[in-house]
Amino acid sequence: MSVNGPGVVVITGGSAGLGRALALSYCAPGITLGLIGRNAERLEAVAAECRARGAEIVTGYLDVRDAAALQAWIFDFDAQHPIDLLIANAGVASTLRSSDDWEGAGRTAEVVDTNLYGALHAVLPAIERMRDRRRGQIAIVSSLAGLRGMAISPAYCVSKAALLAYCDSVRPVLARDHIGISVVMPGFVRTAMSDVFPGNKPFMWSAEKAALFIKKRLTRRRVQIAFPFSLTLGLKLLRLLPATVADAILGLLFQIPRRNM
């Protein structure tokens, strides 16, 4: 890692949305990017954009739910390009779609496997190598939904809340080995993923604006990166209210489908 920032960056979920915007924000001559994604065509398109800006790109067509494959790729990549910064960004969204909808075991497991375990499958191998070097930086993309559960997306909220708790838990331990870990908590970002959520999307940011905001604060090694400010403050204040009052307020903002009796 140079004084100007990380020279080697790995980003999961790098083929679209926020991951693509992050890749483009970091790519420059002298930078090596490891981009991981499931869609080979889209990932290669992002890689081509980054190469055009002078960065060295290594792609991995992987599903983050495949722990063994992801660990093998990260170990192999790190052996050639010691990772300065890993951004665990891959994720999926899920919401209740109708009055009779319910997130059962299958849907809940799919979301948790990708958002929670997929992130851990990426960061744990990287941390292992960073601890050997006694340096490095990890960023995990959670969500403001991790601050307070919403009835419209239970599985998504629990997966993101778990990431926040994980970062808080391991931060003091990793600090002993000079490894920083940051939790990124975006609000609504204009991507295909946000299209899954119906109704109001207050204070929505573009992916490009979000990526630059995140990069700037990762450079400063901020432990929590939450945005936008108004929505962050509102959700933190909701946690101080009685649960029934907070539920009612969120119900007005993010209406769940009503069931006809």
Q: Which sequence ranges carry the predicted segments?
A:
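Conserved glycine-rich cofactor-binding loop
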Residues: 13-16
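Conserved glycine-rich Rossmann-like NAD(P)H-binding loop of the short-chain dehydrogenase/reductase
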Residues: 31-46
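Rossmann-fold cofactor-recognition segment
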Residues: 52-68
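Active-site helix of classical SDR
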Residues: 123, 159
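C-terminal helical subdomain
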Residues: 183, 199-234
